């Protein structure tokens, strides 16, 4: 029952992808391939990164600091609502949260995939098997083993669900 630091901070990562990530991973791989350091890939939509200062962050919405939201329920709610409102790929803003001695910068969401891009993702030769590092049965896989994806996203605003944070509010099929 407490607010944890951003996974970006606790993991020590230079860059994190949020959302479904297919487009972001290609953009990042291409940048790395031409020699751009991960810590300098600050321009890809659908990513988050650490910044020591805001000199290279131009337009953004500031939310209350981690320290404040972890100790003030009203500040937490306000920060969540700002994050929720900015999940639209077309109008969503870059979010900045002070976090200790620096800032967590969350770029605006990535655009939804086109129909052809989405078809290409689901045409990949998935095995429907767990990663080889798992040696024991994973009960949660039984439920989805033979599932079909008919669409992504959800326009609902259910209080108990975070699907829009993962797949967005735009229905893609």
Question: How does the language model describe each region?
Answer:
Residues 1-100, 104-107:
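Glycine-rich beta-alpha loop elements in corrinoid/cobalamin-binding modules
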Residues 85-173:
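Radical SAM [4Fe-4S] cluster-binding motif and immediate context
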């Amino acid at each position: 029952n407490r607010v944890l630091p951003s996974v970006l901070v606790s993991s020590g990562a230079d860059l994190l992808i949020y959302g479904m990530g297919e487009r972001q991973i290609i953009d990042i791989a291409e940048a790395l391939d031409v020699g751009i350091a991960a810590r300098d890939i600050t321009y890809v939509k659908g990513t988050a990164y650490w910044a020591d200062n805001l000199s290279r962050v131009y337009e953004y919405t500031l939310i209350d600091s981690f320290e404040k939201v972890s100790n003030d329920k009203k500040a937490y709610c306000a920060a969540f609502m700002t994050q929720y409102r900015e999940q639209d790929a077309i109008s969503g803003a870059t979010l900045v949260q002070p976090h200790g001695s620096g800032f967590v910068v969350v770029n605006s969401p990535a655009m939804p995939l086109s129909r052809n891009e989405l078809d290409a993702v689901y045409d990949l030769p998935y095995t429907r098997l767990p990663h080889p590092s798992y040696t024991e049965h994973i009960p949660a896989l039984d439920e989805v083993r033979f599932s079909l994806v008919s669409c992504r996203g959800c326009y609902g605003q259910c209080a108990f669900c975070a699907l829009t944070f993962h797949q967005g509010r735009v229905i893609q099929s």
